[in-house]
Structures are given as C-alpha cells and as structure tokens.
Design a protein with these regions (language model features):
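C-terminal end-helix/capping segment
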Residues: 83-99
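Low-complexity, intrinsically disordered Gly/Pro/Thr-rich segments
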Residues: 76-83
Length: 99
C-alpha cells in the first residue's frame, strides 16, 4: 500500500532550498518516491491558522520504504540543509498511509 509524505514549509533561504532539492531528488528516486504535487498553489477551505508558503505530497511504495528513506545514510546529511532553508516554526513532515 502506498505511503505519503506531506511536507509543509515556509522558505527562509531559496538558494539553500534549491541545493536541497537537487541533492534530495536522486535519493528519493532510489527509494521509488515521486512527487504527486508541490508548490504554493494551496488554499485553506475551512479552519483557521496560517498556511505554510509551500506544500508537497511525495508518494512512496509503502510506509516501510518511506521510513527507510528518512533514516537512510544518504538522507541524514540533507536534513540539516533542509532545516537551514526553511522556517522551523512552520515546517512539518507528516506521514500518511494510503487507503
């Protein structure tokens, strides 16, 4: 069953985020992940609160693969780069199992 990584971010440093994107793309591919959508074209339909600047949904083959990617030796060095590029008060990485 597929699993999804939902990413919410507000950008602090666009150049660092681009560097992260370039470096993380082949690591995601190695784990069979693909972006379903990404960008800033989201709207709040109900509820209250601030929206992040960007969102993404990444599909993985299953939850075990998603967790293996996150914990992998290839991805661990990229976490600090990602964190330096975004506002830590608005960033969230959320996992969701597919139905």
């Amino acid at each position: 069953m597929p699993a999804y990584l939902i990413v919410q971010q507000t950008i602090r440093d666009a150049e660092k985020l681009e560097e992260y994107r370039v470096k993380v793309t082949p690591v995601l591919a190695k784990y069979g992940a693909r972006f379903l959508t990404k960008g800033a074209g989201h709207k709040l339909l109900a509820g209250a609160g601030a929206l992040p600047e960007r969102m993404a949904i990444v599909e993985f083959p299953d939850m075990a693969t998603l967790i293996a990617w996150y914990n992998s030796a290839e991805y661990q060095p990229l976490i600090a780069l990602r964190q330096s590029a975004v506002d830590p008060n608005t960033e969230a990485l959320i996992t969701l199992e597919g139905a």
